[in-house]
Amino acid sequence: FKKSEFNRVSQALRQPGSAFKPFIYALALENNYSPSTLVLDAPLVLEQGSDLKMWQPENYGKKFYGPSTLRMGLEKSRNLMTVRIAQDLGLKKIVNFSKKLGIYDNPNELLSISLGSAETTLLKLTSAYCSFVNGGKLVKPILIDRIQDSEGNTIFNTEKRECKKCNQISFLNKEVPKISDNFNQIFTPETAYQITSMLEGVIQRGTGRKLKNINLDMAGKTGTTNKNTDTWFIGFTSKLAIGVYVGFDNPKSLGKYETGAKTA
């Protein structure tokens, strides 16, 4: 803090790259896709408008696998599959979905957003990942959970959740208490379950397999931007979500072989 008061977690706007892809795939699952749906992984050239060059997105390593499952596309972080999914979903759906999750405020409606071209913060992106492990509900980050006095009495609690029938002495032949919450349901619990399973595959077989030997049930996604300028890894267990970003304050390449899978 003595060197810089700038908070790179909450203030630095950077492109998330492939770390944004899980939200494209989650939206696809909300729109009648399944993890086994086949999507073409092949070259693609798109018009960007008059007086603009044709856009030709590429896969990392410039390899193509042909028709591939949605699960494999996320595990292997296939750019061309992701763009095709985005074309099918439509940009308005993608932009609205990202805004509901708090990732972006008003991003440009460009297909490149599906590959993480719009800028966000590490805090916003990590918070959005929490929705996967919370059944599709958006949980906003807080700094203070609760405050207790010297005798252990809670004098402040951030969450004011109502628990109906929690004061019952016995639960025999009675309804089990339910704790309500005020979290917004962004997508279905079924989608959250499927995406979590697919992101577990990223750790087991995909770009995050360097974490495979950690003795934890973990899911997550790597991210790398053009010229290896920004590298990311956002991961989570059932109890904790962690976001890692590596990059310079003044954007420049970290090196030819520096990726989210390696550096972050």
Feature map (PLM): residue ranges:
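Short pre-catalytic segments that frame enzyme active sites
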Residues: 1-20, 26-68, 76, 92-113, ...
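A small/polar active-site loop signature that marks catalytic segments
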Residues: 79-99, 222
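Structural motif corresponding to the C-terminal cap of alpha-helices
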Residues: 81, 102-105, 203-206
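A glycine-rich, coil/turn loop motif that links secondary-structure elements
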Residues: 112-120
